[in-house]
Amino acid sequence: MPRNVIIAIGVIFFGIIAFDMMGIIVRLLGDTYPILQIAAMRNFFGMIPALILLAHARQFAALPRLNQPRLHAINLLRSTSVVVAQLSFYTALTKIEFATAGALGFSGPIFITALSVPLLGHVVGVWRWSAIFIGFAGVLTIMQPFNDGFSAYMVLPVIAAFCYALSSILVRLYPQDMPSAAIQLGQQIMTCVLATLAMLVFFDPVAITGASDAGLIVMMGAFGGTGVMCLVIAYRLADPSSVS
């Protein structure tokens, strides 16, 4: 296995741990704050890892390079898909068992492999297609759509997985020499704006109650931002279909 693929897989595992920590906090906050407010706060504080990396590498000069019509379109599509994913997954975390939501969320690699064919022109062999079909069979086994225990909320993590996969695939369309932290910061700003606007339209924001909630919100953003940063780095290191 190529060294870059091994490194990318390791980075993704670290990102998965960060996402799990974020998910636990989202579940804790979900009974108090509207989901869109949680998404807006998560995206605001999710800028922290990107800012730290940009400062450490002294790469802030790369940010103006994002100001291109083509990159604006990619960023808007990525950000919109992420907001939909967050709304879907965060809602699921508050409505179904954490383990079930997490397991269904792991269907992301299935969508990444499938989407890499039309969007990136990758060739996926028969073994990977077989893995995709087996993966979908596993998703259906968990959901049990024709069982009495099925809940429509179980569809939400799968929608989230598809949207996160789309965002991950689109990151390959950025120039290879563009710093990953710059890409991530641009996306975090846009997702924060979109989630905040949606929150103001559909919900009344709830005041943050106490230092403990404030601390959880900051950690949620930091974990989430770290997780997404890991995905951006991993899928730029190696072909998404190979890593997935």
Question: How does the language model describe each region?
Answer:
Residues I7-G15, A62-S88, A152-A160, M199, ...:
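Loop-to-transmembrane-helix transition segments
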Residues I24-R27, D31, I35-L36, A50, ...:
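Transmembrane alpha-helical segments that form core, pore/gating elements
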Residues F89-T91, G108-S130:
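C-terminal transmembrane-helix exit sites in multi-pass transporters
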